[in-house]
Amino acid sequence: NYLDSRTKEDVEELASHHYEIWAKETGNPQPNCMFPAMFARWMMNNCEGFKEKGRKFMHNAPYILANLAGLSAEDAFIDWGTMSGWGLGYRVTEKKWSKEQLEILGIPMEMMPKIQKPWDIIGTLSETFAKETGLKPGIPICAGAGDTMQSMIGCGVIKPDQAADVAGTCAMFCIATDGINEELSKPENELIFNSGTLENTYFYWGFIRTGGLALRWYRDNVCNEAGNGAYFDELNEKAQNVPCGSNGVLFLP
């Protein structure tokens, strides 16, 4: 969803209302094209079939885990870190959906999955998928956690004022805090606020939407090496011979 801007006009319209509840409850002062909350709103407004037959909104990882455990739509869940990845629609410190925000977004509360702790056991591996995977049936399955949230643990960023620079699909700089910071949550800073995996952990992050994707674009469209994963090694070797400062060349993804 980093490059999916289908919600751009809706984001601009919603942002024009300057709802203070966004920053107060989520730490995010305004809507963003990347927020799943905006994609959910888009589906509610543009997909008649979904409005008629849809039961729950789910992220891909919880959806896979729910299927492995043989859960029904009524058992749909989301961990509290991934919940905060919605961007809007929840109370981040309480780890609960926000009735007021969801009403503004036009998303029915009953379509939201229940919020779990990342280490909660949501079920066990079903007989069907035990055969598919070659694993033993009955293995406990926990709710899991969001990718960036887990990256912060992997980097050791779990205490306020610690930070990490992450170069992935989306280039990110993250800094841990002890909660919502009014100064950092000002709209002009364009930062995103999330709950971490562990209890009472939070972080802000700034980003470039096409950080790592820009490398693939360069390989495919400039070097004409589409699909050649090994070509990145060749680019790395060539980059080693470039002097610091890249001779004044600046690339903006």
Task: Please state what every model-predicted region is.
Residues 23-146, 253:
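Gly/Ser/Thr-rich active-site cleft segment
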Residues 15-19, 44-51, 67-72, 105-109, ...:
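Structural signal for hydrophobic packing residues in well-ordered secondary-structure cores
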Residues 85-199, 210, 226-237:
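ATP-dependent carbohydrate kinase catalytic cores
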Residues 1-37:
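Active-site phosphate-binding/coordination module
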Residues 6, 38, 62-63, 170, ...:
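Alpha-helix/helix-capping structural signal
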Residues 36-43, 68, 151-155, 214-218:
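Buried hydrophobic packing segments
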Residues 1-16, 49, 71, 175-253:
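Glycine/Thr-rich phosphate-binding loops that ligate phosphate moieties of nucleotide
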Residues 23, 32, 48-50, 54-56, ...:
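A general structural signal for short secondary-structure junctions and capping/turn motifs
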